[in-house]
């Protein structure tokens, strides 16, 4: 066997070259505060099908069933690997559904996931400019949406989220606005336009709706988070461009827990940031990921892969976040951080 040392960057990733190779660097936290979160475990491994992920980009947890849905974008030259995975935060693999393509029930560039009060799964597809719908066990139910810039039309839809009335809010990314629909696809309202003023957007991405129906939007290219009333009136904003605490370099998603604390995946800064309800910075997390049960089980069954890991260098990097793309809070209050390039979800619990 060759003694050449190889660099390994993620949990069991053996796939094709990544779409983007970020700057590699060792990081050390200089924070003196006690962390408000404790790392729990990791879910996921790189896998072409079945128990694992392939370039996962979105997740959603059903608060009634506990099932977690993960959208796998894969790569354009392996569209058969595009799929939705069903599992749990406790690493129980349930199944998968859909595949890559342009037909009804297929996906191409999945971007956002949300679950309605009837346990149906909704997915935004930024290539197909539509919302697709499945039952909780993966039966295709229908779709809606057309491409364009008029009211109710979509241009690269991104994050999606349901409010308390079961209306679906859609981040209409390339139209730089938020649109509200009934879950059947009837247009209700919209707000936003291109720009950097209050209530304007520059390629917005992720969205969150809190228990009071306030709307939070990750304003991606403006490097900030904006908060709106349920009617779409501007409430506040926080963040600026940079790499310091409270600054962002392309924030991709936002989540709010039951205490009102806010979590932001700071995509190009390779980190998760936590804020209080007023947008004041509380803590910056760099990642503490370990091998998942899925990853360990695969390595246990393959001595060659174990030996390759033992001979690899750069393993100290794999615990850190690499371009975290989505964040969610599950029914138990656990913080879930999704990483496409490391094909995993890091799970954290909030300290009392």
Can you name each region flagged by the protein language model?
Residues 2-352:
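Eukaryotic scaffold repeat domains enriched in small/polar residues
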């Amino acid at each position: 066997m060759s003694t050449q040392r190889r660099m390994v960057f993620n949990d069991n990733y053996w796939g094709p070259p990544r779409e983007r190779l970020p700057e590699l660097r060792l990081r050390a936290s200089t924070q003196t505060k006690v962390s408000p979160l404790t790392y729990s475990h990791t879910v996921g491994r790189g896998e072409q099908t079945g128990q694992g992920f392939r370039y996962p980009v979105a997740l959603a947890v059903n608060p009634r069933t506990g099932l977690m849905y993960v959208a796998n974008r894969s790569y354009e030259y392996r569209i058969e690997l595009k799929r939705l995975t069903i599992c749990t935060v406790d690493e129980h693999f349930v199944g998968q559904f859909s595949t890559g393509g342009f037909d009804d029930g297929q996906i191409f560039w999945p971007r956002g996931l949300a679950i309605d009060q009837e346990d149906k799964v909704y997915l935004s597809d930024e290539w197909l400019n539509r919302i697709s719908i499945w039952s909780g066990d993966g039966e295709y139910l229908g779709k809606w949406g057309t491409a364009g810039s008029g009211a109710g039309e979509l241009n690269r839809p991104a994050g999606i989220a349901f409010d308390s009335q079961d209306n679906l809010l859609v981040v209409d990314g390339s139209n730089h606005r938020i649109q509200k629909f009934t879950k059947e696809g009837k247009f209700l309202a919209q707000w936003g336009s291109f720009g950097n003023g209050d209530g304007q957007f520059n390629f917005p991405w992720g969205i969150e709706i809190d228990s009071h129906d306030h709307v939070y939007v990750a304003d991606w290219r403006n490097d900030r988070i904006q908060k709106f009333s349920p009617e779409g009136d501007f409430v506040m904003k926080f963040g600026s461009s940079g790499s310091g605490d409270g600054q962002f370099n392309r924030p991709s998603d936002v989540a709010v827990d039951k205490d009102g604390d806010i979590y932001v995946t700071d995509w190009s800064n390779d980190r998760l940031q936590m804020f209080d309800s007023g947008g004041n910075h509380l803590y910056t997390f760099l990642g503490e990921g370990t091998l998942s049960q899925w990853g360990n089980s695969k390595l246990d069954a393959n001595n060659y892969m174990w030996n390759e890991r033992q001979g690899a260098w750069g393993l100290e990097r794999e615990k850190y976040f690499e371009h975290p793309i989505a964040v969610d809070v599950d029914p138990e209050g656990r913080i879930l951080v999704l990483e496409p390039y490391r094909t995993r979800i890091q799970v954290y619990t909030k300290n009392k």
